[in-house]
From Swiss-Prot:
Pfam family, one: PetL
Domain of life: Eukaryota
Keyword tags: Chloroplast, Electron transport, Membrane, Photosynthesis, Plastid, Thylakoid, Transmembrane, Transmembrane helix, Transport
Name of the protein in question: Cytochrome b6-f complex subunit 6
Gene source species: Spinacia oleracea (Spinach)
């Protein structure tokens, strides 16, 4: 169960980083 929790935590971190980069690119395009 610990490995499953860490796996979901890794997915959440990856999703957050990806969304942050996507928003950053959109802001750069708007400028």
């Amino acid at each position: 169960m610990f490995t499953l929790t860490s796996y979901f935590g890794f997915l959440l971190a990856a999703l957050t980083i990806t969304s942050a980069l996507f928003i950053g690119l959109n802001k750069i395009r708007l400028i």
